[in-house]
Regions:
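Structural marker of alpha-solenoid helical repeat scaffolds
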Residues: 64-67, 98, 132, 166, ...
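Structural signature of tandem alpha-helical TPR/SEL1-like repeats
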Residues: 50-59, 81-94, 115-128, 138, ...
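Terminal, low-structured helical/coil segments at or just beyond the last alpha-helical repeat
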Residues: 28-38, 178-183, 187-190, 208, ...
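Long, contiguous interaction/recruitment modules in multidomain scaffold/adaptor proteins
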Residues: 2-39, 50
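Alpha-helical segment of the N-proximal tetratricopeptide repeat
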Residues: 36-83, 111, 115, 196
Length: 253
């Protein structure tokens, strides 16, 4: 099931990329009065999206140039937010037909396939998008999530590490507008949070590593021997903070 959060799809599934040329920037949206008649149709749609008025956004985007892959992608995102995955996919594919190298739309089709548990298909789309836009942190994070769903933990770690390298805040961004959807829903949350702890530990981010490690324990991760032997935690293993965390017997959420 898709749960959409501003900036991403949290499947744990978000609208995460910056707005493209010709669209309103988030800072503008916070200061511009709601006067649709003074805006272009695409800008009107962006403003409706920021206000979570998705049906109105779709109507506004339909008045924008229909030769724009970006507009079709944004309509797809609006349908995605409404939970109409069939319509969302149709609009993403139209965007790709207009611009076969539009990585955002290719990624967004991947998020549809992910929600349908077609993880192989999702991975193929994400890799295709990354071949075009290798610097897109949100797509790397989507790839990692899909690998996790298939139980491919080393591949997940590599993809997530790349995402964090490109954007250290990739898992915490809350951009209200954009053209890229980001997946974040997983099954085994305890194992997921443990893997996230290892990834952040490898990146040297102690605060987030221990935060995710605590979450994994709260979600029921029981293999403390695995935690104790994981080389990613070697730098902190003898600290009192780490010892106290491992000694905890938290109430499972």
């Amino acid at each position: 099931m898709h749960k959409l959060v501003t900036g991403r799809i949290l499947i744990l599934p978000l609208i995460a990329a910056a707005l493209c040329a010709g669209s309103l920037l988030p800072a503008q949206i916070s200061t511009v009065a709601f006067q649709p008649s003074k805006l272009s149709p695409e800008q009107q749609g962006d403003l409706f999206m920021a206000r979570k008025m998705f049906r109105e956004a779709i109507e506004a985007y339909r008045e924008a140039p229909q030769t724009s892959a970006i507009v079709w992608d944004k309509m797809g995102i609006a349908y995605h937010q409404l939970g109409d995955l069939a319509a969302a996919k149709k609009h993403y594919e139209k965007a790709i037909k207009i611009d076969p190298k539009y990585s955002d739309a290719i990624n967004n089709v991947g998020t549809i396939l992910y929600s349908q548990k077609n993880y192989r298909g999702a991975i193929a789309r994400y890799n295709r998008a990354l071949a075009i836009a290798p610097g897109a942190a949100s797509i790397w994070s989507n790839l990692g999530t899909a690998y996790y769903a298939r139980g491919k933990y080393p591949e997940m770690s590599q993809a997530y590490a790349k995402a964090i390298q490109l954007d250290p805040a990739v898992f915490d961004s809350h951009n209200a507008l954009g053209t890229t959807m980001q997946d974040r829903s997983v099954g085994d949350k305890a194992r997921y949070h443990y893997e996230m702890a290892r990834i952040y530990a490898s990146a040297g981010n102690k605060e987030l590593a221990l935060q995710y490690l605590r979450k994994s324990l709260e979600e029921g991760f029981k293999d403390k021997d695995k935690i104790g032997k994981a080389p990613e935690f070697d730098a902190w293993r003898d600290t009192q903070e780490f010892k106290d965390l491992i000694a905890l017997e938290p109430r499972v959420l």
